Amino acid sequence: MSKVKILVAVVNHSKTSGCPRVDGVTIAEYAMNSHSQIVSSGLWRWLQGTGLERFELVRTADDWIFRGTILTLAADTAAEAKYEIFCDRSFHTKSASISLLDSNGERRLKIEAQNGRWFENGRENQAVNGATDIDLGWSPSTNTLPIKRLKLKIGESSGEFVAAWVRFPELTLQPLPQEYLRLADRQYRYSSRGGAFVASLTVDDDDLITDYEGFWLRVNSTR
């Protein structure tokens, strides 16, 4: 049985917004955070160079949250990327907030998905309309989204579909055709661009990547 932490707080009413707030956030945001649970967390090591990512999978009453911090070298320059992805209970992407800090300063990207339409910092990106999943170029976390959503049987293929791919360090959003084939209980073959890129993926009980062939390796995990 999980432990429940009871929080008592004084609610202040903001004079500027008129919205009740607790510790600087709205009541709705406070309630969501108070009832969230970290399902899994871990560390991935980048195998193509210098890089680490700390990751958390969080469950709330209504959403799944994928949250990570990436430290790496981009063009021999230190870079830090942070992201937070909100998905519904069926792992369909709802929104994402991404920030990147490097020698060029800090940049931010806000993505929203609404009924098959994708918005990039408030502007519709028609090139990725119809996509269901977001795909982060610097992280193996988002491979979990189609794996969870599709629930493939062993030997079954997803067929080709388009993901909304976030390129790093450009922080641009573009379509990426891809396909998943379930090879075994915890193993998948991932391919993109019609087979131009192929890699084997090994997952854990939560369908999080433990080994992304040649690119990422999970070095620890907690549940």
Language-model segments: which ranges?
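Solvent-exposed helix/loop surface patches that form functional interfaces
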Residues: 28-54, 108-189, 193-194
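Short N-terminal edge-element motif at the start of the domain
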Residues: 41-86
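Beta-turn initiation residues at beta-strand->coil junctions
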Residues: 70, 97-100, 122-123, 192-193, ...
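C-terminal structured interaction module
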Residues: 193-223
